[in-house]
Design a protein with these regions (language model features):
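Proline- and Ser/Thr-rich low-complexity, intrinsically disordered segments
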Residues: 1-175
Length: 175
């Protein structure tokens, strides 16, 4: 409608200029009173104000896992006290909020906490890094004559061992 200007507001918080500031004012019933002109009495109308809090998805985080580690709860990696019941998205499908480094991909996983209108959804991310365990190769053997030239121990390992490891044994190994 078209209420008469110049009325007064009353309610749970002081109204200045007919404006409600959800950051500083309380929710509740606000009453607008339009003054009457004799012999007509003043009339009132009300506005019920609901103020929804925005969702809190937590704060961004990161985790580094080994591909042989057990599954980890992504929700526990969010900072703060995030709202429960949100949804996960990322490079792999997240089931039950868990990431299994043996079967899922590294990357950025997004947690979305649903907002209650008119508050929008909010998101936080977890950056997941998945490292592979070192590969020392498989056991090997070598038989040498004491007059043979030096031989590479690394070449005696089976499989595809990672370079750059360290050696230990009954004698110092150089190189």
């Amino acid at each position: 409608g078209t209420p008469d200007a110049g009325g007064t507001w009353s309610g749970p918080s002081a109204v200045i200029g007919g404006l409600i500031d959800p950051a500083t004012m309380s929710a509740g019933v606000y009453t607008y009173t339009a003054a009457g002109t004799t012999p007509c009495p003043g009339e009132t109308a009300t506005v019920t104000v609901t103020i929804n809090a925005p969702p809190f998805p937590g704060t961004d985080g990161s985790i580094t896992l080994c591909s042989t580690d057990a599954a980890v709860d992504l929700f526990a990696q969010l900072g703060g006290t995030p709202d429960a019941g949100g949804t996960w998205s990322g490079p792999s499908s997240v089931v039950g909020g868990m990431i299994d480094p043996a079967t899922m991909s590294a990357g950025v996983y997004t947690y979305t906490a649903a907002g209650t209108a008119p508050c929008p959804d909010e998101t936080a991310t977890i950056t997941v890094t998945i490292n592979t365990p070192p590969d020392p190769g498989t056991d090997g053997t070598i038989t040498l004559c004491s007059t043979d030239a030096a031989a590479s121990l690394f070449a005696q390992l089976g499989g595809t061992p990672d370079a750059g490891g360290t050696w230990s044994g009954p004698s110092a190994v150089v190189g």
